[in-house]
A protein has these predicted regions:
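Secretory targeting signals
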Residues: 4-20, 25, 40, 47-89, ...
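A short amphipathic helical element positioned immediately N-terminal to and/or at the very start
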Residues: 23-35
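Generic structural signal for small/hydrophobic residues in well-ordered secondary structure
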Residues: 30, 108-110, 178, 184, ...
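Residue-level recognition of membrane-helix boundary sites in multi-pass small-molecule transporters
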Residues: 39-42, 100, 113, 187
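Transmembrane helix segments
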Residues: 185-220
Length: 269
Protein backbone atom coordinates (compact mmCIF):
# COMPACT_ATOMS: atom_id res chain seq x y z
CA UNK A 1 0.00 0.00 0.00
CA UNK A 2 1.39 3.33 -0.99
CA UNK A 3 0.63 6.80 0.29
CA UNK A 4 0.82 9.95 -1.75
CA UNK A 5 2.87 12.62 -0.03
CA UNK A 6 2.32 16.22 -0.99
CA UNK A 7 5.65 18.01 -1.33
CA UNK A 8 6.14 20.80 1.16
CA UNK A 9 7.39 24.07 -0.19
CA UNK A 10 9.83 25.78 2.20
CA UNK A 11 8.38 28.97 3.60
CA UNK A 12 10.07 32.31 3.61
CA UNK A 13 10.04 35.14 6.09
CA UNK A 14 9.46 38.55 4.59
CA UNK A 15 11.54 41.13 6.45
CA UNK A 16 11.18 43.86 3.89
CA UNK A 17 8.66 45.73 6.03
CA UNK A 18 10.73 45.52 9.20
CA UNK A 19 12.30 48.80 10.20
CA UNK A 20 15.77 48.83 11.70
CA UNK A 21 16.33 49.93 15.25
CA UNK A 22 17.16 53.63 15.24
CA UNK A 23 20.42 54.95 16.62
CA UNK A 24 18.45 57.01 19.13
CA UNK A 25 16.73 53.92 20.47
CA UNK A 26 20.02 52.02 20.66
CA UNK A 27 21.57 54.90 22.59
CA UNK A 28 18.63 54.98 24.99
CA UNK A 29 19.00 51.26 25.61
CA UNK A 30 22.73 51.60 26.28
CA UNK A 31 22.13 54.54 28.61
CA UNK A 32 19.53 52.54 30.49
CA UNK A 33 21.89 49.58 30.74
CA UNK A 34 24.52 51.85 32.29
CA UNK A 35 22.18 52.97 35.09
CA UNK A 36 20.04 49.86 35.55
CA UNK A 37 22.82 47.96 37.31
CA UNK A 38 23.46 48.74 40.95
CA UNK A 39 27.18 49.19 40.29
CA UNK A 40 26.68 51.76 37.53
CA UNK A 41 23.89 53.64 39.26
CA UNK A 42 25.57 53.87 42.65
CA UNK A 43 28.94 54.74 41.17
CA UNK A 44 27.36 57.67 39.31
CA UNK A 45 25.73 58.78 42.57
CA UNK A 46 29.05 58.32 44.38
CA UNK A 47 30.83 60.58 41.88
CA UNK A 48 28.35 63.40 42.47
CA UNK A 49 28.54 62.79 46.22
CA UNK A 50 32.33 62.94 46.14
CA UNK A 51 32.19 66.22 44.23
CA UNK A 52 29.86 67.60 46.91
CA UNK A 53 32.16 66.43 49.71
CA UNK A 54 35.24 68.00 48.12
CA UNK A 55 33.34 71.24 47.48
CA UNK A 56 32.26 71.44 51.13
CA UNK A 57 35.81 70.85 52.36
CA UNK A 58 37.13 73.48 49.97
CA UNK A 59 34.45 75.99 51.00
CA UNK A 60 35.47 75.64 54.64
CA UNK A 61 39.24 75.61 54.20
CA UNK A 62 39.97 77.82 51.16
CA UNK A 63 41.07 81.46 51.47
CA UNK A 64 38.25 83.99 51.22
CA UNK A 65 39.62 85.37 47.94
CA UNK A 66 39.51 81.93 46.27
CA UNK A 67 35.83 81.11 46.63
CA UNK A 68 34.48 82.22 43.26
CA UNK A 69 32.16 79.98 41.25
CA UNK A 70 34.98 79.36 38.78
CA UNK A 71 37.13 77.95 41.61
CA UNK A 72 34.42 75.50 42.65
CA UNK A 73 33.69 74.57 39.04
CA UNK A 74 37.38 73.86 38.44
CA UNK A 75 37.46 71.58 41.49
CA UNK A 76 34.35 69.76 40.28
CA UNK A 77 35.97 69.24 36.88
CA UNK A 78 39.15 67.96 38.52
CA UNK A 79 37.25 65.34 40.54
CA UNK A 80 35.17 64.28 37.55
CA UNK A 81 38.30 63.97 35.43
CA UNK A 82 39.56 61.15 37.65
CA UNK A 83 36.37 59.15 38.11
CA UNK A 84 34.25 59.74 35.00
CA UNK A 85 36.37 57.37 32.84
CA UNK A 86 35.69 54.54 35.30
CA UNK A 87 31.95 54.96 34.75
CA UNK A 88 32.53 54.75 30.99
CA UNK A 89 34.74 51.68 31.43
CA UNK A 90 31.92 49.96 33.32
CA UNK A 91 29.51 50.83 30.50
CA UNK A 92 31.77 49.44 27.77
CA UNK A 93 32.97 46.28 29.50
CA UNK A 94 29.47 45.21 30.56
CA UNK A 95 29.16 43.27 27.30
CA UNK A 96 31.92 40.92 28.42
CA UNK A 97 31.94 41.13 32.22
CA UNK A 98 28.15 40.72 32.55
CA UNK A 99 27.84 38.50 29.47
CA UNK A 100 25.48 40.86 27.69
CA UNK A 101 27.32 40.55 24.40
CA UNK A 102 25.30 37.62 23.07
CA UNK A 103 22.04 39.49 23.63
CA UNK A 104 23.28 42.87 22.45
CA UNK A 105 24.84 41.68 19.22
CA UNK A 106 21.98 39.30 18.46
CA UNK A 107 19.46 42.12 18.64
CA UNK A 108 21.84 44.42 16.73
CA UNK A 109 24.21 42.27 14.63
CA UNK A 110 25.98 45.31 13.23
CA UNK A 111 28.43 45.78 16.04
CA UNK A 112 29.66 49.13 14.76
CA UNK A 113 26.21 50.65 15.30
CA UNK A 114 26.01 49.20 18.80
CA UNK A 115 29.46 50.59 19.55
CA UNK A 116 28.52 54.08 18.33
CA UNK A 117 25.35 53.91 20.43
CA UNK A 118 27.41 52.96 23.46
CA UNK A 119 29.74 55.92 22.89
CA UNK A 120 26.75 58.25 22.48
CA UNK A 121 25.28 56.89 25.72
CA UNK A 122 28.60 57.48 27.46
CA UNK A 123 28.72 61.08 26.28
CA UNK A 124 25.10 61.65 27.38
CA UNK A 125 25.84 60.11 30.75
CA UNK A 126 28.93 62.28 31.13
CA UNK A 127 26.93 65.37 30.17
CA UNK A 128 24.35 64.58 32.83
CA UNK A 129 26.98 64.09 35.51
CA UNK A 130 28.73 67.33 34.47
CA UNK A 131 25.46 69.25 34.79
CA UNK A 132 24.95 67.83 38.28
CA UNK A 133 28.55 68.69 39.18
CA UNK A 134 28.06 72.26 37.95
CA UNK A 135 24.97 72.48 40.15
CA UNK A 136 26.97 71.15 43.10
CA UNK A 137 29.55 73.88 42.39
CA UNK A 138 26.74 76.41 42.88
CA UNK A 139 26.05 74.88 46.29
CA UNK A 140 29.75 75.06 47.12
CA UNK A 141 29.90 78.71 46.10
CA UNK A 142 26.90 79.54 48.30
CA UNK A 143 28.53 77.72 51.19
CA UNK A 144 31.75 79.61 50.51
CA UNK A 145 29.89 82.91 50.79
CA UNK A 146 28.58 81.82 54.19
CA UNK A 147 32.11 81.08 55.42
CA UNK A 148 33.54 84.50 54.71
CA UNK A 149 33.96 84.63 50.94
CA UNK A 150 32.63 87.21 48.50
CA UNK A 151 32.21 85.03 45.41
CA UNK A 152 32.23 86.20 41.82
CA UNK A 153 29.67 84.22 39.85
CA UNK A 154 31.00 84.87 36.36
CA UNK A 155 33.05 82.04 34.84
CA UNK A 156 35.94 82.36 32.43
CA UNK A 157 34.91 80.82 29.11
CA UNK A 158 38.25 79.02 28.76
CA UNK A 159 37.81 77.43 32.18
CA UNK A 160 34.27 76.35 31.33
CA UNK A 161 35.13 74.85 27.95
CA UNK A 162 38.75 73.69 28.25
CA UNK A 163 39.09 72.96 31.95
CA UNK A 164 35.63 71.49 32.51
CA UNK A 165 33.83 70.30 29.37
CA UNK A 166 36.73 69.39 27.05
CA UNK A 167 38.81 67.76 29.78
CA UNK A 168 35.92 65.51 30.81
CA UNK A 169 35.01 64.63 27.22
CA UNK A 170 38.63 63.54 26.76
CA UNK A 171 38.20 61.43 29.89
CA UNK A 172 35.17 59.76 28.32
CA UNK A 173 37.18 58.78 25.25
CA UNK A 174 40.08 57.56 27.41
CA UNK A 175 37.74 55.33 29.41
CA UNK A 176 36.07 54.14 26.21
CA UNK A 177 39.42 53.32 24.61
CA UNK A 178 40.71 51.37 27.62
CA UNK A 179 37.40 49.56 28.02
CA UNK A 180 37.18 48.41 24.40
CA UNK A 181 40.85 47.44 24.36
CA UNK A 182 40.72 45.19 27.44
CA UNK A 183 36.99 44.26 27.66
CA UNK A 184 37.42 43.31 31.31
CA UNK A 185 36.20 45.62 34.06
CA UNK A 186 38.83 44.99 36.79
CA UNK A 187 41.73 44.95 34.33
CA UNK A 188 40.51 48.12 32.61
CA UNK A 189 40.08 49.99 35.91
CA UNK A 190 43.56 48.96 37.05
CA UNK A 191 44.99 50.03 33.68
CA UNK A 192 43.20 53.38 33.95
CA UNK A 193 44.61 54.11 37.41
CA UNK A 194 48.06 53.11 36.20
CA UNK A 195 47.64 55.57 33.32
CA UNK A 196 46.20 58.43 35.40
CA UNK A 197 48.16 58.08 38.66
CA UNK A 198 51.30 55.99 38.30
CA UNK A 199 52.38 57.12 34.83
CA UNK A 200 52.39 60.88 35.65
CA UNK A 201 54.49 60.21 38.76
CA UNK A 202 57.00 58.19 36.75
CA UNK A 203 57.14 60.87 34.07
CA UNK A 204 57.62 63.55 36.72
CA UNK A 205 60.56 61.67 38.24
CA UNK A 206 62.19 61.14 34.86
CA UNK A 207 61.63 64.81 33.97
CA UNK A 208 63.33 65.87 37.20
CA UNK A 209 66.31 63.66 36.39
CA UNK A 210 66.64 64.61 32.73
CA UNK A 211 66.00 68.01 31.19
CA UNK A 212 65.94 66.40 27.75
CA UNK A 213 63.11 64.07 28.78
CA UNK A 214 61.28 67.00 30.37
CA UNK A 215 61.07 68.62 26.94
CA UNK A 216 59.86 65.42 25.31
CA UNK A 217 57.34 64.40 28.00
CA UNK A 218 54.42 66.64 26.89
CA UNK A 219 54.66 65.17 23.40
CA UNK A 220 54.38 61.55 24.51
CA UNK A 221 52.48 61.59 27.84
CA UNK A 222 48.84 62.66 27.67
CA UNK A 223 48.39 63.69 31.32
CA UNK A 224 51.35 66.05 31.10
CA UNK A 225 50.14 67.44 27.79
CA UNK A 226 46.73 68.29 29.29
CA UNK A 227 48.11 70.40 32.16
CA UNK A 228 47.54 73.72 30.28
CA UNK A 229 43.82 72.90 30.17
CA UNK A 230 43.67 73.10 33.98
CA UNK A 231 46.20 75.79 34.85
CA UNK A 232 47.08 79.40 34.06
CA UNK A 233 44.55 81.04 31.79
CA UNK A 234 43.20 77.63 30.68
CA UNK A 235 44.25 78.44 27.11
CA UNK A 236 47.00 76.24 25.64
CA UNK A 237 49.37 77.83 23.17
CA UNK A 238 49.76 76.56 19.62
CA UNK A 239 52.63 74.30 20.63
CA UNK A 240 50.70 73.01 23.64
CA UNK A 241 47.70 72.17 21.43
CA UNK A 242 50.10 70.25 19.18
CA UNK A 243 51.41 68.38 22.22
CA UNK A 244 47.85 67.53 23.28
CA UNK A 245 47.07 66.25 19.79
CA UNK A 246 50.26 64.19 19.51
CA UNK A 247 49.99 62.60 22.94
CA UNK A 248 46.26 62.10 22.36
CA UNK A 249 46.95 60.04 19.26
CA UNK A 250 49.29 57.81 21.27
CA UNK A 251 47.13 57.34 24.37
CA UNK A 252 43.60 57.80 23.06
CA UNK A 253 43.23 57.39 19.29
CA UNK A 254 45.43 54.31 18.78
CA UNK A 255 43.96 52.38 21.77
CA UNK A 256 40.46 53.35 20.62
CA UNK A 257 41.09 52.07 17.09
CA UNK A 258 42.63 48.82 18.36
CA UNK A 259 39.83 48.38 20.90
CA UNK A 260 37.17 48.98 18.25
CA UNK A 261 38.77 46.41 15.95
CA UNK A 262 38.86 43.92 18.81
CA UNK A 263 35.23 44.50 19.78
CA UNK A 264 34.12 44.05 16.17
CA UNK A 265 35.88 40.68 15.95
CA UNK A 266 35.74 39.22 19.46
CA UNK A 267 33.65 36.08 20.01
CA UNK A 268 31.26 36.41 22.93
CA UNK A 269 30.46 33.22 24.83
Amino acid sequence: MSTTVTPVTPGTIDLSGTTQVSMLQLSRVELRKALDTRAGRWFAIAIVGLVLLVEVIYAVTAPDNAKDYGDFLGIAGFVLGYFMPILIIMLVTSEASQRNGLVTFTLEPRRARALVAKLAAGLLLAAGVMVLAAAVAVVGTLLGSLTGGSPVWSVDANLLFNGFVLANVVGVFIGFAIGTLLMNTPAAIVAYFAYSLILPIAVGILSALSSAFEKVAPWIEFNTAQVPLFTGDYTPSGEEWAQIATAGVIWMVIPLVLGTMRLLRIEFK
